[in-house]
Design a protein with these regions (language model features):
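Residue-level marker of alpha-helix boundaries and capping positions
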Residues: 13, 269-270, 396
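Short secondary-structure junctions
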Residues: 28-31, 84-89, 284-289, 411-415
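Short, conserved phosphate-binding/catalytic loop or strand-edge motifs used
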Residues: 95-105, 418-423
């Protein structure tokens, strides 16, 4: 068996080896720091046994994927601590996220004093140093297990899985959770953590479901890294746009108007007008032509474009398909509208590329628990562009789009740490 490491070097073994055994074979220091392995691109437990040729990367908390495993384990320690102190709490889900981790519980809200007590209990659990073990059950046995423990949310998750599925569990001491993993080998690996806040969240993000209590936390490999992160969070609070925007009289919100529907104050209108003129001028320089399309359309348009099937739950729908002859919806995006601008005329291939630009007001029915300031709202204005191009023009036009985005971000001073997502 030949194992190819991240640096291209190779290790040859006569028999199967676990990821942690290979880590020790590389160096004891690496093994002590290891959080997980990445085998042929898949993140796995350190206890995973490798029995065939593969590419292997040993992940530590310095790696984004390794840190995610550490934080996922921290969420399990959190859940164990909560159920130790609050035995009636029902567990839902507890993933790692970009900034840390969270876990959702069906129980009354937690106070800051509660969070402090939970932190202390987590430290006790970590000090005991229980090993983390993975095991599996059949779908039927897994459902019976959580029914006996009166954990309805776990039962629901398992029931959504196909019949015949093998269900994985992770246990630490006498506490067990449903989980696909991976996790650290011991709770001792959670060395530096902090519970940050508690809030409400709907089960599975739907307002039709039960309201749960969510605890947010973060975790790092060292106390110094945690301290640095917490200091950055405090600085971010001081610079929070939601706070500064109100202080500078740029925008405000009013309960009677509704969540995610900000009032733009005169100072904010001036800023928006300046930004709009600037970006439209930049687009014009680059050959964009302006369009102005309706704020709503019949459901037929969204069915043709495919948005109805995929985004209907996130749209503001006017009317009832069962009783009304026509059903309308406020637009969540502009693309199908600008496509019909193109279709309104005949075009030659010589007319291409056609670059349509529009400053669009869009509407999206966001969950109330997801909204904050201007970062997640139900009505917003963006600069949108859609291009009709020939195949031989695609590469250049794509590069020009990225160049425009980079230029705008650079002018606004936010060009660093930008990630581009293609959909």
């Amino acid at each position: 068996m030949i194992v190819t490491l991240k640096d291209g070097s190779k290790k040859e073994y006569a028999e199967a080896k676990s990821v942690i055994d290979i880590a020790y074979d590389i160096s004891e220091g690496l093994a002590r720091a290891a959080c997980a392995g990445e085998v042929n691109g898949e993140v796995v437990d350190l206890r995973t046994v490798i029995d065939s040729d593969c590419e292997l990367n040993i992940l530590t908390a310095k790696d984004e994927k390794g840190l995610a495993v550490l934080r996922h384990t921290a969420s399990h320690v959190l859940a164990q601590a909560v159920q130790t102190l609050f035995p009636d709490a029902k567990v839902a889900i507890g993933p790692s996220i970009d900034t840390g981790f969270y876990y959702d519980f069906d129980c009354p809200p937690f106070s800051r004093d509660d969070l402090d007590a939970i932190e202390k209990e987590m430290k006790k659990i970590i000090k005991k140093g229980a090993k983390i073990e993975r095991f599996t059950k059949s779908r039927e046995d897994a459902i019976a297990y959580f029914q006996e423990k009166n954990e309805p949310y776990k039962v629901e998750l398992i029931e959504d899985l196909p019949e015949g599925s093998e269900i994985s569990f992770y246990s630490q001491g006498d506490w067990t959770d449903l989980c696909a993993g991976p996790h650290l080998m011991s709770v001792k690996g959670v060395k530096a953590f902090k519970l940050l806040s508690s809030s409400s969240a709907y089960w599975r993000g739907s307002e039709k479901n039960a309201m749960l209590t969510r605890i947010y936390g973060t975790a790092y490999a060292s106390k110094d890294e945690l301290k640095e992160h917490l200091e950055q969070m405090e600085e971010a609070k001081r610079r929070d746009h939601n706070k500064l925007g109100r202080e500078m009289k740029i925008f405000t919100t009013v309960d009677v108007i509704g969540q995610g529907l900000p009032l733009i104050m005169p100072n904010g209108v001036i800023m928006m007008q300046e930004l709009q003129r600037w970006i439209e001028d930049e687009e014009t320089k680059r050959g964009y032509i302006r369009t102005k399309t309706p704020l709503m359309a019949k459901s037929d348009l969204y069915k043709i474009s495919g948005h109805w099937d995929h985004y209907k739950e996130g749209m503001f729908v006017l009317g009832d398909e069962e009783t009304d002859k026509e059903v309308f919806a406020l637009r969540p995006m502009t693309c199908p509208f600008q496509y019909y601008v193109y279709k309104a005329e005949q075009h030659s291939y010589r007319d291409l590329p056609l670059r349509y630009g529009e400053t669009s007001t869009l509407f999206r029915n966001e969950d109330s628990g997801e909204m904050h300031g201007l970062t997640r709202v139900r009505q917003f204005t963006i600069s949108e562009g859609h291009l009709i191009v020939r195949p031989d023009q695609m590469v250049k036009e794509f590069k020009d789009c990225i160049a425009l985005a980079q230029y705008c971000l650079q002018v606004l001073g936010v060009e660093e740490d930008v990630t581009y997502h293609l959909s």
